């Protein structure tokens, strides 16, 4: 699924493995003015790849597992330096949704500690 940020084409497209990761990115505010492509499954990378042809920059927020690494490699092989791995944002987590959940949990715990004082 391609989610356009505006009527006019954006210079960057962000790629997500699943819809929950896309919604997590929106919640975290990392989508900016970029268009977003949700693969729904890494098996769809070849079908979806043609949608990325017109973008100068492709940011990948893929799962930090073997399937995510293969998908990143396939996109890098096709688009070269236009592709950027953005998964360092959620280093230590499987995916962006897990990162959001942990971040939210930490914020709640910190808020509770402040209220207790």
Predicted regions: what they are:
Residues 11, 27-117:
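TOPRIM fold recognition
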Residues 14:
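Glycine-rich, flexible N-terminal cofactor/catalytic loop recognition
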Residues 17-20, 64:
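Helix N-cap/beta->alpha junction signal
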Residues 1-11:
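Glycine-/acidic-rich phosphate or pyrophosphate-binding loops and their flanking alpha/beta elements
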């Amino acid at each position: 699924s391609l989610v356009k940020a505006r009527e006019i084409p954006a210079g960057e497209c962000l790629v997500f493995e699943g819809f929950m990761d896309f919604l997590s990115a929106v919640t975290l505010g990392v989508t900016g003015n970029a268009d977003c492509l949700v693969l729904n499954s890494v098996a769809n990378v070849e079908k979806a790849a043609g949608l990325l042809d017109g973008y100068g920059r492709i940011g990948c927020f893929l799962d930090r597992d073997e399937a995510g690494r293969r998908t990143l490699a396939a996109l890098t092989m096709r688009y070269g330096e236009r592709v950027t791995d953005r998964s360092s944002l959620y280093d230590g987590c499987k995916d962006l949704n897990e990162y959001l959940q942990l971040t939210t949990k930490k914020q709640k715990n910190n808020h509770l500690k402040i209220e207790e004082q």
